[in-house]
């Protein structure tokens, strides 16, 4: 049931290193191979972040962009707005001095302007600004709108925050649905509540899987309740509202619960995992039902003797069931990506290095920023790309594709190009085959 993702080293490579005893790979995770631009991170302030609320309930967090994005593709969060048309917000300044906070509302279908203005009457207290966005009275119930906030800092930089919004026809729908989703999640950790969980599942052998990396409403009860895994939550649950629909047949809301868990493996070593649990709740005549359920689990992978062996790399429990890796033509080096972190291994020299570490602390980070290995040569030199929302200090707030070169001997990583894009990572992933190719030794 606790199926893991494993990369198997090629047969020829195994023959080349077939020596007595276990192979120990040296880890170079604290090397100088991090992106040279990361040196700038200590010099540059982080961008302000916005936390959105529905009453006292947090329903989403927005990261800022210093470039314009395609609004139609920015669907990470939707803001449910109460009948009072008020949206409580909190801005974490991250050391920036905020001059103004503006908003802009557009029609979802034709992008025409509905409302814009400036949010007044706020004060900063200890690096946090509490304020309220008042939605326009002309916004219709159940209709979806583009909503953008613009923060101007003292350095005259404008930072953009993209989301969507919809006016609700009742004030208790969202809090009750979130409470219901959280309760369902809690029940999956309690075997005594398994009958409560089973009541909402639709098991189908056609979709059966023995991997804990992903569980859905069609999975077996044992998979959903973590049967033999027995993890425990080690972080708060962070809720993000994804979709809201209001119809005559009821109201549906989709919410993602992000949190971390910890479990002990067969070697008695504690391992941590990022979890994204998405629940679609349908409310009809005051009663809640589950329309869809999806749970993704990704182990926070560490390069150690438990995960790297004689002829394999054990990537642990991951949503992805197979891992694409690149191998040098002399079959001495292999390179791969796991959860935004990039690794390259010298099979003969029994050495493994990390050219880039995303250090994702949540599934939201994994969703917005991704990595892809392009090529590794016979000397262990690597070309890879980082795409989506940039966490680099040099490109902070930008979105696009960074083309990176890694030098094995010098153990250094250098950015050779940055290509801005107004499309988020999930769209770029689908286009990556066209955007990334290998020709005469260059990207």
Region spans (language model):
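N-terminal Sec-pathway targeting helices
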Residues: 1-16, 23-25
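Sec-dependent signal peptide cleavage junction
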Residues: 20-43
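Core segments of small alpha/beta cavity-forming domains
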Residues: 40-102, 109-112, 147-152, 158-230, ...
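Surface-exposed, charged secondary-structure patches
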Residues: 72-88, 100-107, 112-119, 132-149, ...
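Beta-propeller fold detector
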Residues: 115-118, 292-293, 353-361, 412-421
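Aromatic sugar-binding surface patches on proteins
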Residues: 122-134, 365-368
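Short, solvent-exposed aromatic-acidic interface loops
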Residues: 167, 291-302, 420-423
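Exposed beta-sheet edge and beta->alpha loop/turn motif
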Residues: 252-290, 294
């Amino acid at each position: 049931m606790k199926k893991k993702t494993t990369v198997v080293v090629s047969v020829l490579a195994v023959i080349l290193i077939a020596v007595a005893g276990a192979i120990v790979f040296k880890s170079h995770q604290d090397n100088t191979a991090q992106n040279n631009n990361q040196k700038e991170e200590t010099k540059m302030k982080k961008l302000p972040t916005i936390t959105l609320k529905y009453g006292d309930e947090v329903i989403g967090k927005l990261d800022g962009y210093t470039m314009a994005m395609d609004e139609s593709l920015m669907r990470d969060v939707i803001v449910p707005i109460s009948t009072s048309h008020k949206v409580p917000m909190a801005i974490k300044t991250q050391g920036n001095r905020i001059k103004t906070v503006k908003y802009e509302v557009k029609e979802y279908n034709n992008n025409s302007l509905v409302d814009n203005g400036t949010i007044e009457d706020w004060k900063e207290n200890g690096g946090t600004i509490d304020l309220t966005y008042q939605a326009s009275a002309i916004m219709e119930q159940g209709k979806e709108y583009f909503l953008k906030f613009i923060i101007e800092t003292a350095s005259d930089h404008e930072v953009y925050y993209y989301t969507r919004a919809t006016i609700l026809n009742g004030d208790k729908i969202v809090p009750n649905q979130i409470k219901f989703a959280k309760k369902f999640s809690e029940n999956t950790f309690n075997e005594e509540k398994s009958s409560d969980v089973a009541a909402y599942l639709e098991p189908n052998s056609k979709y059966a899987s023995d991997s804990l990396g992903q569980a859905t409403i069609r999975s077996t009860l044992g998979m959903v309740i973590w049967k033999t895994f027995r993890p425990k939550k080690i972080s708060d649950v962070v809720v993000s509202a994804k979709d809201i629909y209001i119809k005559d047949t009821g109201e549906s809301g989709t919410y993602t619960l992000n949190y971390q868990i910890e479990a002990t493996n067969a070697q008695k070593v504690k391992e941590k995992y990022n979890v994204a649990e998405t629940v679609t709740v349908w409310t009809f005549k005051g009663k809640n039902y589950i329309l869809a359920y999806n749970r993704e689990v990704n182990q926070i992978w560490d390069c150690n003797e438990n995960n790297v062996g004689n002829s394999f790399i054990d990537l642990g429990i991951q949503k992805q069931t197979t891992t694409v890796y690149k191998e040098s033509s002399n079959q001495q080096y292999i390179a791969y990506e796991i959860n935004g972190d990039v690794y390259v291994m010298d099979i003969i020299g029994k050495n493994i290095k990390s050219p880039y570490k995303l250090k994702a602390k949540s599934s939201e980070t994994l969703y917005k920023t991704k990595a892809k290995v392009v090529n590794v040569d016979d000397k262990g030199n690597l070309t890879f790309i980082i795409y989506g929302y940039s966490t680099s200090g040099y490109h902070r707030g930008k979105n696009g594709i960074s083309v990176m070169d890694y030098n094995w001997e010098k153990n250094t990583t250098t950015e050779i190009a940055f290509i801005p894009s107004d499309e988020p990572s999930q769209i770029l992933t689908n286009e990556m085959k066209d955007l990334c190719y290998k020709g005469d030794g260059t990207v």
